[in-house]
Structure formats: structure tokens, C-alpha cells
Amino acid sequence: QNRPFSGEGIISGWGACRAALPAALQALRRGDVSRAALWGYNTAYFRGQGAKFAAAMAQLPAATEFNAKDTNYLFRHRIIFNGRDFAEMAQTYEVAMGPGKLLKMITFLLWGVLSGQFQASTLKILLRVSGQAGKLKKHYLHFPADPAAFPQWQAEAARLWGEAG
């Protein structure tokens, strides 16, 4: 449950504990600590923090594919790696992408490609991993409330992770 973007795990571990608390209390009160009785924790975790972490994990390997010129362009124009994004990621485990921010990002990326300051191949990587991250997050947001549905969910998750690389 460590944060995919920093490796830190104390705060996110406490977040997981908060997700576990309702299911654990209910199970203890009922005297039933079976897998089924505690399943609510899995549902709460994977539909919340887990979905955000899955999206982040899908995007991380792409950063190793960027060359120095493209990475510097992203930093210089504060497209991806800026202080506000890092602060938001630390607090909410994701970066909100409103229409204004998205338009600015697209404009700078396209300008970078057209002006030769940013590679089209890197833009393709960004688009690919963003799409995969979105698919994974959506899948995790639909984590099954019923343990019997887990094998089917898990098979689809494995397929999506396979596509993500």
C-alpha cells in the first residue's frame, strides 16, 4: 500500500486502515471474521485508494522511456511534473484534470511536437499509458462487492495489466 509515486507508505497505510475499520468493526460485532464478512474492506479499498494507485502504477514505467530532452520539456513547461501536481498527488493520490488544465497540457504537447522540442513518439507513449491508466482505474472502481464475483474481476484485471505492460 505504498504510494506508487514516492514509495512512502505510512499515510497510505493509515488510509487503508480507515477503509478497513467499518468492515472489521462490523465483523467483530457479529463474531464473524470470515473472508466474506471482511470483504467490505477489499471493496472500500480497491474502489478508493486502490483505484488511484492502480492508475498511477500503470503510468510509472512510461517515465523511464522518456529521453532527457522530452523530460526537460515536461518540466520546463510544467506539463506533468510541477509542485502543485506533486502536492495534490500527496494529498489525494491523483491529479485532477479539469478542462483548462487538459487544454493547456494538450497545447504545450502539440506545440512541442510541431516545433521539434518534444518527440511524437513520447506523446504516443503518454496517450497510451493515460488510456491504460483510465481503464484500470475504471475497473478498480467496479471492484466486486460480492466475493463470488472476484475471479471474473481478477481475470479482467490481469488482462488490463497485461496490456499496460
Question: What are these model-predicted stretches?
Answer:
Residues 13-15, 21, 87:
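C-terminal catalytic subdomain
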Residues 1-11:
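Glycine-rich phosphate/pyrophosphate-binding beta-alpha loops
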Residues 6, 19-74:
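Active-site-proximal substrate-binding core of FAD-dependent oxidoreductases
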Residues 64-165:
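C-terminal auxiliary extensions adjacent to catalytic cores
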Residues 11-14, 60:
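Short, low-complexity, polar/charged sequence segments that are solvent-exposed and flexible
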